[in-house]
Amino acid sequence: MSKIKPLSKSSQDLSLLTSDIASFASSIGLASALPSSGFNDTDFRKPAKSKTQKRKKPKKDQQHKDEDEEGEPKSNIGNEKGKDFGARKQNKDAPVKQTLQPKPKPGFLSIDDESTGYKKKRFDEFKSLPKLPLVKASLLSSEWYNDAAEFEEKVFGGRKVAVANKEDFKGVVEKKRELGERLMWQYAEDFATSKGKGGDMKMVISAQKSGTVADKITAFEIMVGENPIANMRSLDALLGMVTSKVGKRFAFKGLKALSEILIRLLPDRKLKSLLQRPLNIIPENKDGYSLLLFWYWEDCLKQRYERFVTALDESSKDMLPELKDKALKTIYFMLTSKSEQERKLLVSLVNKLGDPQNKSASNADYHLTNLLADHPNMKAVVIDEVDSFLFRPHLGLRAKYHAVNFLSQIRLSHKGEDPKVAKRLIDVYFALFKVLTTEANRKQGADDKGAADKKKSNPKDTKQEVSTDSPIELDSRILSALLTGVNRAFPYVSTDEADDIIESQTPVLFKLVHSANFNVGVQSLMLLDKISSKNKIVSDRFYRALYSKLLLPSAMNSSKAEMFIGLLLRAMKNDINIKRVAAFSKRVLQVALQQPPQYACGCLFLLSEVLKSRPPLWKMVVQRESVEEEEDIEHFEDVIEGDDVDPNKKAENDENVVEVDHDGVEKSSRDGDSSSDDEEALAIRLSDEEDDNASDDSEELIRNETPQLEEVMEVSNDMEKRSQPPMRPSSLPGGYDPRHREPSYCNADRASWWELGVLSKHAHPSVATMAGTLLSGTNIVYNGNPLNDLSLTAFLDKFMEKKPKQNTWHGGSQIEPSKKLDMSNRVIGAEILSLAEGDVAPEDLVFHKFYVNKMTSTKQSKKKKKKKLPEEEAAEELYDVNDGDGGENYDSDVEFEAGDESDNEEIENMLDDVDDNAVEEEGGEYDYDDLDGVAGEDDEELVADVSDAEMDTDMDMDLIDDEDDNNVDDDGTGDGGDDDSDGDDGRSKKKKKEKRKRKSPFASLEEYKHLIDQDEKEDSKTKRKATSEPTKKKKKKKSKASE
């Protein structure tokens, strides 16, 4: 025992070292689940030496005979003796022997799903067995399923064979499975002997063992493509790269390669296992064995494909976003290509709608939409799976939103099973809506209970938050997606099924109309409009809700403004009640006064389209709002019962004429409140009675298009006998009440559209043009979308002279793509000058004026430069004459003046319109011609050899004269005398003419040469005198000193 202990310690150290190396190799990605991938930690071991040591151990230790006998079959670790030995003995040598024993290398083939590899003993047993008659590997094609179909035709002759009972059939399946494993080994050996000895195949096999990752993947693809049945080991190697949890870089490269290989291997039908085959009647001949080989291969392929799908599902849940997206793309690729395991793949793809990352959830939505576009027959299957996903417990709102958003993007039609699919979608939408509302109510109840408990615990706290939201309020995005889906699916539902939906879901939709979110309310109104148009039933409740939505501030500022205007147009065109249409038109004009230009133009264009279908509304454009007492007009007064006396009756009898001019100025002589709460409640209570007469009054207004006041109202005998309650007084003329909740009874047909007069004076030219067109009695002709064409972004694009974009667009859904702004016919930049002002669109008049002014300013600046050309020539002549320092200084001055003029060119262009005379009177500009004149005079004085004293006196006199002139000018401007200003203007003009006619002050050298010679002689004389005078002074000083 003392001899064994040091051996066990060294063996333990060796095992620890090998395990550390193996773990390090696996951490850097060198090892995989299968040793056949080209690298294994057993490469570090020496199997030959370890075997010899194990064989020598029994000779050294003769005391442990039982241990030696049990330790002989070391090649099979999992046998029963080894298990019994590990259970009976707890010796220190036993773990040493187990750790030293290397894992067996896998055989050539495997049928097990375990990651331990192939069982070598079983293949060794096949070597001793005789070979069975089997088809040669070289005779088969690359498409194994076609070869299998041929063998089935040979064996069974095309007849259908029933499969036996599964319980009695399991024993036969196990026997046939072992036989199929033997046939596959024999088939692989045949392929290795026939084609594996070539140079190309040897190079591929060497790349499998000792190549890079890319080389190994390429080698595996070549081997599987050459013969998939004989090279299942290569397929398992690729599958091990994907299923391995170590080294995710292998999964990136292995997913694409393995998916492409499996697409080629899988048939167009679903794979079958051995339990689904008639194995009990298969003959034991060459064709029968060959057919059993194909069936066994199909069973193995089915098992491996299930492992691949499971690996894809795990990869789609990985924390690495790139691997997750790669797995999603592979799932979509396998779903669209083959039908095998489509249920599991679809579940994995739908589950990604609940991914915590928005990008992954959006990718799943995108892939599902493309899947239905490629396979429209899968709509029902996909909807059922999404339905089961939506109603899972504890599912988040974000996941539900993505699921509903996907369902709303499904394209439908009136053909085939699509009407049933549309009905199924609507059922899902409303079922989800009920679940969401119940959850919201339950949550609100719990919050209220908690707040009540908190109030009881803190009685001093008087502040309490009151929730003003209705119990219907939910996440606006989910509600918007739900209503979008219902709006898209409802037109495709059959008429019989649509009636059931209307009866059960209309109350819910009216609750959603009053939601705090404007987009939800608009979509609810759209659905109600579709319901009413499909059943041809006009709902006063719908028009009342739509009329109230117009006053909301978010009506034109939301993302659904275009949808809301379209809904208004459809509702007003389909309405037969002319009074209600007039009320809507009046309110639309009121809204247009308060909105930006693009929405104001949209409202005016809406009214133009309504006027086409309702011509009686044209008289409201020009009619005056007045109630005058005339003899030929019938007046109806309410019957006053008892001693009720109207306090305002006397005022109404005295002054009944109330007028409003069309500029929007009201002239009213009535004083009083507009309404009271009691009278409003009474009017609402009587709205049902007035509904009966609304249609009759509208028909009378349609028949009486000409304004004949005598036939405006016709009252039947029943109406004369009926006593009418007193209506509430209105502060507006004509009885128009803008605050009435019922549009049919606000008397908008008596009001005038004076808002058009205000809009015709709008600052925006497009608004003014459209309003003026309606005032002139003609319809607006516009082919674009004013909400987009007149927006601020479109104006800035034009101002920046932005060129049109390409025709490609991005964004939007496939069922409702985003609309691209049409910029093909847009006139950009200076091109607008080619059009006349009358041909320019109103919204482009600003740019037309801008470029016209810019062109005129450039022309004026060019003319000014041409006028200054003679002065520049004079300066150049001066520069040519003066070659000394004086010339250089003058040149710099000229350059400075030229730069100053170029810098101030824009300022001079702005001052062109100012009167030159006024500028000279104010002394605003400095005349550089005066400076040239002074310079010329000074030069002449210098040439004439004037003494310094005389020059100083002359300059002083000039300065005095200039001061006198300035004083005279100041006095003239201060007194405001016209004569002096006219005289000054004349003098200044004469001076300018004289300066223009004056010759250049610089004379030629030849003309004044004799004067220059005289100057030189005089200079010499003066020098002589200067030298003689000092000598005389010295003599005088000496004489004085002697004296």
Swiss-Prot record:
InterPro entries: ARM-type_fold (IPR016024), CCAAT-binding_factor (IPR005612), CEBPZ/Mak21-like (IPR040155)
Keyword Ribonucleoprotein: no
Span(s) of short sequence motif Nuclear localization signal 2: 441-448
Keyword tags: Nucleus
Distribution of this protein across tissues and organs: Mainly expressed in actively dividing tissues (e.g. root tips, lateral root primordia, shoot apices, young leaves, inflorescences and pollen grains) through the plant, including roots, stems, leaves, inflorescences, siliques and seedlings, and in gametophytes.
Subunit-level organization: Interacts with RBL in both the nucleolus and nucleoplasm. Binds to NOC2.
Family per similarity comment: Belongs to the CBF/MAK21 family.
Protein name: Protein SLOW WALKER 2
Lineage: Eukaryota, Viridiplantae, Streptophyta, Embryophyta, Tracheophyta
Name of the gene encoding the protein in the UniProt record: SWA2
